[in-house]
Structures are given as structure tokens and as C-alpha cells.
Amino acid sequence: MHLHLLLILALFRAGCVVAGPSYSLSGSWRVSNGNGSLELPATVPGYVHSALHQHGLIQDPYYRFNDLNYRWISLDNWTYSTEFKIPFNLSEWQKVKLIFDGVDTVAEILFNNVTIGKTDNMFTGYSFDITNVVKDVNSLKLQFRSAVQYAECQSKAHTSYRVPPECPPVEQKGECHVNFIRKAQCSFSWDWGPSFPSQGIWKDVRIEAYNIAHLDYLTFLPVYDNASQAWNIEIKASFDVASSKSVGGQVTVAIPQLKTQQTNDIELQQEQRIVKLLVKIRKDVAVETWWPRGHGNQTGYNMTILFALDGGLKIEKAAKVYFRTVQLIEEGIKGSPGLSFYFKINGLPIFLKGSNWIPADSFQDKVTSDRLQLLFQSVVDANMNTLRVWGGGIYEQDEFYALCDELGIMVWQDFMFASALYPTEPGFLASVRKEVTYQVRRLKSHPSIIIWSGNNENEVALSVNWFHVNPRDMKTYIDDYVTLYVKNIRKIVLSEDKSRPFIASSPTNGMKTMEEGWISYDPYSIQYGDIHFYNYADDCWNWKIFPKARLVSEYGYQSWPSFSTLEKVSSQEDWAYNSRFSLHRQHHEDGNHQMLHQVKMHFKLPQGTDPLRTFKDTIYLTQVMQAQCIKTETEFYLRSRSEIVDGKGHTMGALYWQLNDIWQAPSWASLEYGGKWKMLHYFARRFFAPLLPVGFEDEGVFYVYGVSDLHKDHHTQLTVRLHHWSSPKPLCSLVNSSIVVKAGEAVVLFQMPVSELLKRCRGCTRETCVVSFYFSTDKELFSPTNYHFLSSLKDAKGLLEANITVNISQKGNVFVFDLETSAVAPFVWLDVGSIPGRFSDNGFLMIRKKLSVLFYPWKPTSKSELQQAFSVTSLTDTY
């Protein structure tokens, strides 16, 4: 706990200096359970589980079966308490407030044994007037109630009709009635995560004292005025006025780099607390706009806002302001029924390339700045430009959005409602209104957020009737849906933020959904809006099973994390694919079988006698399968951006499910818990490259498309090669040296019947050869070599067990792995166990005899440590 001038990291790591003191209560507290049998120190911000683990009272909650073993923690009622002395003279201040930025979730707050308020929503801040109860020495208690028990009680109180789903599927081993509490919906379990319905003070808590007035919030929105062809900034500030009299003053906004300074007179009263300003940017000053990654710079300008009020009060806020426009284009497409669905940033159509973000941990106090920055570096390194913040988790911390702004990562922001129906009692709706207002005001100044989405999959849940509600009752549920997402959430968003689009759900049909009364007849329509698509039964190498939709905001396949990640939370008896641990960790129904089903279509399952080797090989094959499946699907979406075929196409976004993991378990993630890259993430780095050749077959003809995110046409050379599996030396090459890849398009550059291709390369059959192809570009432009399999690899002939030798050397902070192979090696996987870092490439088809790969460590390591931990695997090693 410490005293400081008020410094709030509310927007863009901005600072706000106030004449009154701000005293942080973060730091060391005490926490005790319901019957008082446990009492221990606890850190705030933090969680009960974290405190128990830190003091050795429980193991790692993620170890083996501890999600079940420690269920008692979430069922108990815990109390956080602290005592503190006010380090300033209370008599000098008219008003004193106790402010919580986040309480998780249901608690009664006692200040000096006086109840000053209650909390029931994890997603909003709370402010309490303690002027009349604060003393020089004070006690503060938060008496938490079990979120599980609270949700059950709220559900039981809703007696008029059921609000499904009552409980999660049994595979998830979770708790019931999560839709009755405003808390991270995945905290009660999900099909990729555990049930840890935690309790704690998860964000900052502080005391603020002031005279005259206090700045409660401040937002700013740059808006481009088409009529005047100039930028304006809409600024809105809200004050708590302590004085009974009106308070006059001035506000000055300055942006030195844009030669902008504007001063306005203002007047505040207790009933008139809002200040609205329109700051006009000079037309003769060039404004550099903010661009998504890969399309330009993320230029921002330092802005100061100074409120000089009567009585000598000065409140200054410094922030970074970014200028950009966003449009969601829904209009007719020639040759296709329906409407387009794509985004324009600063007037330029942008293909969304990225993934879906889930909470990085069940316990947010573990998501440190370093950990967050490491995850974002992996996003950037994989050539992504978009993250969808999924609606079953949390509105992310301020640093998350600041990083998105700085790095050019667009954000598709869901509101936190997912895969469920929700009650619409007055109390629930009032809490949601506070939540939505709070979050929109907190986040709307971030240029990275390009769209608000009301929920995850709740429109389709009603349209398809996921929860088997009686058709006679469907109107009640539809009315509840419209009440919550349209009449409340949408109404608030449109009132608070007109700068970006809002859709009621994802997936949705956009404008078509509105026309159909907000529940579309077919939310999965590929002619409108966005879709979510999953298919675990059909062959994922067959691109024809995938929908040629306008934008695909979810799609994916599962895999297992690496053995080095699992080893930390398991014991030797767990190391088998069908062990009790493996079955327990799989929360998706039939998930383990579905992975093997896909693997068996194209690969041979391990047949070894060593159980541990078999387990490791199976893990490897699930990662190969996942990477190859999502490569095939993503490349289909990428090459569909510029074409309409049979009325389908104009795909302008591919966000695979999912980016990150919440714990160590099989999931759809490309990044394991702890940040290690799965094979899929290396594939994503390649298939999201700014210039990519994409190959596929249709009716016996082999095609190569050129897919470009570049802003200019690119003149290059395309080389197509055939290789025999037994030798890295290419059998033949076809070269076209006059290729033009169109800017921002996907176009056919090469086509040839496979039979003709094989004729030109004597000695090749579908089973004995593989195709590679690449653009010849300068070193500054990343354009990877791609490949196409002419048969399933389980049918490949001449595929030898490659002897791959490796020599490791060090150059500065980077390590060089020089590889040499005796034969073409599919899916070469370099692994250094638990040593944190990533390779420049991995999981690749090694078609050259020699290859150098770089390793970038995330922490200091040595050549000897790498040599000891290193292993290399290719496909034939699993036979």
C-alpha cells in the first residue's frame, strides 16, 4: 500500500494527475475461509487459489486432477481483510471514495464494520462514498460468497421458466448455472478449460480524496468529417462534483505534433457533471493514420487535456490518440446472392488474419506483463493482424488493448455472453447495463477495436434450438434475447460509441439478421455475415468440405500439447493416450477419438512397444494433423477472397480457433500454456505471410494461386518442383519468370493437369513424389515455400526414414541449427523441451539436403543446455 498522486492506467497507459491524494490498498491482505479454520496472507490483486498455493497449502491447481480435488475452495465463502492508516489529513478533503477496479465476484463490503455496498459483477468497477465512515485507522473486509452457490440460488429464484443450459456437458467436469452470474463464463469450465470459479480482488483497489470535483472518466474518439475533410476528436468527461455550488473553469486540449491547442470554458454542477468537447484538427496539418499490422504504421500522437477549475484545482490527463476509420461493408456482390461482410480501415479493404483469444489463465493474477507481451510477440511473429476476444472469458486488461494499439492488432470484441440463454430480470439487466457502459467507456478510445459483438453463438443457439426448448416457449426466449442484446446492450453501445460497428452475435447474418427480427433463419448462411465452422468427421485435406463464406470467425481442430508441457502437471502413470489423466484432461466430447480419426486418414498410427515413445509419437501426430488441417482450411479461405464461384466466395477473414491455452490440455490452441509454439503456430506464420503461393487440386488439375496483402502489384518468379520422396534433389522444375501477383487479391497463376505434371517429370507417380512451389522475392519480403501432397502419406512410396543430423552453434543471443538430411523428410519437428523460445521455422517439409534454422531463446540459455534437451522428429520416425 502506498500514497501517490493519482495515476490511472485507464486508457493507453495514460496518466491523470489530481490535486487530491490517491492511496493504493493493493499489496498484503489476509484471507480466511468460512469457518475460520484457515487464515493466511494474500496478495491483492489476487485470488484465493493463488494465496493457498503460494503458502504451500495446496499444490499447483493445474496438477493432475486438482481441478476436482480443489473444488471445495470454490464452494467455500472467503473473506479478504486488511487494516491501514490513512497517510494524509482527512480534514483537508471534502469527499473520500473507495474504488475497486474489479471484484470477482459476489461480495459484501464492510468498511470499519459498516456495510457500504455489495458487488455481483466481475466486469464493472465499483466506487463507494466513505466520507462519513473513514477514520485515520481503518479496517476493510470483503466477505465473498461462493460463486457456485450464488449462481444456483439465482437460478432457483427464476421459477417462471428454465434458462438453459443448466449444467455443462459431463466431459467438462464443471459447475452449473454460470449464465446466472456476471463472471467469466469459462470459469465454471469449458470444452478446453477447467472449472475454477475463483474468488478474489482481481484488480486495483484504492482510496481517493478530493475537493471541488473528481474526474470519474474521460474518453476520446477521433472522427473523420467527410464534409470538411478534416479530423475532429470527440471528448467526453464525467465529474463527481463535491461542491454544492457550480464550478467554473477551462479545459485545454493540446496535441503539439499536430499544432493543435484548443481552450473551452466549462461549468460543472452536481446535476450537470458531463463535459463534451469537439476538438478540431487543423486541415493544413497532415495526420498520419493508424493501420493494422502489415498495412502501415501505428502512428499515435501525444495529447494532454488540462482541466483548470475554480479553487485552483487542476486535473491533467496525458494520453496517446490514434486516428483511423473503420467501416463494416455489407452490400450486394455481382454474381452472388446475399451481402458482403468485410472491413475497411481508412478506406482500404482488409483481410482479417488471426485467431481467437481466450483468458490466458484461470487466475488473472498470473497473467503478468511479461507473459502478455510474450504472447503478443508470438501473434506478431505469426503474421496475424486480428484477435477476437471471445465472449466466454473476460474484457481484457488495459495492457492487452494498449499492445494491440501499438502493434497494429485489430480486435473483434465480444461482450461476455457465450453459448447460453440468459435471464432478463430487472436486477440482472441493471447489472449488465452498468457493465456494458463501464466497458465501452473504458475501451472505446482504442483504435485497435474495430467491432463490438453482443455475444458468442447465442443467436444460432436459439435459431437451431441447441437447448431443446419447447417450440411453444420459443417466443419467450427470443423476446429475452432481443431485450438483452438489442434493447439494452446495443442501445448503450450506439449511445456511447458511434465510431465502430455493432453486431448482436457471432456468428450472425449482419443486416439480414436485423431484417429477420434479430434471430436469423440460418445464422450459418455463407451468403451473409460471419460463420463458425467445425467438421471433425470428414477428411480435412479435402478443401471442398469447407464453406466458401464471407468471413470465418471460428474454425479449428484439436491437438495435444507437447510432452514437455504435459510433464509438468502429470506423473509417469499418466503418460499414455488413453490413461485416466488423458481422458480427464480432454473436455471435448469424443475429442481424443476425433483426433485419431483424422490422423488415420493420412498417416500411420505408432506401432512401437515402448509406451512412452508411443505417447510422444501420438502427440506429435495430433499436432501434424491439426497443422495440416488448418493449413488446408485457411488457404482455402485466403484464395477465396477475390472470386465468386457458384455464387459463393468473397471471403475476407479467417480467424482460427484458438490462439492460446488456459491450462495444459488437449485443445484447439496453436500456443501451449506457457507460450510454447505448437506446429500449427509455425504453419500460421507461413500461411499468414503477406505474399503466399497456395496450391490445390480440383478435378485432377493442380492450381497455384498468388495471395497478396501487399498494396502494390508484385512482379516475381514462380517455381514449381517435383521431388521424389527418397531424395532431396528435385527431379524437375517448371519456372515462370513473368508472374504478377495482384495487390490485395488472390489470383490463379498456374494450372496444369496432374497427369501432365507427372509426365513432364519422368519417374513420378502420385505416391512417389511431392510438389513444392515458391515465389522468388527479395529477403525483406517473407514469402514461404509451399507444398502439395499428391497422395496420403500413409500411401506414399519411397518415403525413407530420413537420417537428419544437426549441428548447433551460437551467434550472439541466437542459436543456429544446421540440418542435413539423407531424404525428403515431412513435418520435421525440432524440440528443445522446456527451454523457452521459438525457432525461425519448424514442422516443415525438408526438401533440401541442407537447411539452417534459427532458435530465438526467450530466456538466457547455453549451447550445452540446448544440445542436452534437443531432439528432432520427422514423420517416418513414428513408424
Swiss-Prot record:
Substrate binds at residues 190-192, 456. Pfam families: Glyco_hydro_2_C, Glyco_hydro_2_N2, Ig_mannosidase, Mannosidase_ig. Residues 1-19 form the signal peptide. Highest level in liver, high levels in lung, testis, skin and spleen, moderate level in thymus. Activity found in plasma, kidney, liver, spleen, pancreas, brain, testis, epididymis, heart, lung and skeletal muscle. Its EC number is 3.2.1.25. One of its GO terms (molecular function) is hydrolase activity. The keyword Ion transport does not apply. Keywords: Disulfide bond, Glycoprotein, Glycosidase, Hydrolase, Lysosome, Signal. It is found in: Lysosome. It comes from the Eukaryota. Disruption phenotype: Mice are born at the expected Mendelian rate and display no visible phenotype for at least one year. However, they display vacuolation in the central nervous system and accumulation of disaccharides in brain and epididymis, detectable already at four weeks after birth. This is Beta-mannosidase. It comes from Mus musculus (Mouse). The gene is Manba.
